[in-house]
From Swiss-Prot:
Protein name (record): Large ribosomal subunit protein bL31B
Gene (name only): rpmE2
Keyword Ribosomal protein (UniProt): yes
GO cellular component: ribonucleoprotein complex; ribosome
Matching PROSITE patterns: RIBOSOMAL_L31
Keyword tags: Ribonucleoprotein, Ribosomal protein
TM annotation in the entry: none
InterPro entries in the cross-refs: Ribosomal_bL28/bL31-like_sf (IPR034704), Ribosomal_bL31 (IPR002150), Ribosomal_bL31_B (IPR027493), Ribosomal_bL31_sf (IPR042105)
Classification of source organism: Bacteria, Bacillati, Actinomycetota, Actinomycetes, Mycobacteriales
Origin species: Mycolicibacterium vanbaalenii (strain DSM 7251 / JCM 13017 / BCRC 16820 / KCTC 9966 / NRRL B-24157 / PYR-1)
Length: 91
């Protein structure tokens, strides 16, 4: 590997925005927010990255369904593209 071309890979705490559960792992992501985490070497401070979905809240892993705002997505599509009719003109 060439030195100096790879991003810094360091410990980071990810927090699920829905459940509040936190996971300590390694990542290239960083954040200005920090959190204290108890380790075998004492309490350490790590960057905190808040994410929308983790395995703690994803329906595939929890076995529960989550209501998705499909109606809002449909309205956004209709506003953007309107109700376009077939392109054939009757001349």
């Amino acid at each position: 590997m060439k030195p100096g071309i790879h991003p810094d890979y360091h410990p980071v705490v990810f927090q699920d925005a829905n459940t509040g559960k936190q996971f300590l792992t390694r990542s290239t992501l960083t954040s200005a927010r920090t959190v204290e985490w108890e380790t075998s070497e004492g309490v350490r401070e790590y960057p905190l990255v808040v994410v929308e979905v983790t395995s703690d809240s994803h329906p595939f892993w929890t076995g529960s369904r989550r209501i998705v705002d499909a109606a809002g997505q449909v309205e956004k599509f209709r506003r953007r593209y309107g109700s376009r009719k077939s392109g054939a003109s009757s001349d």
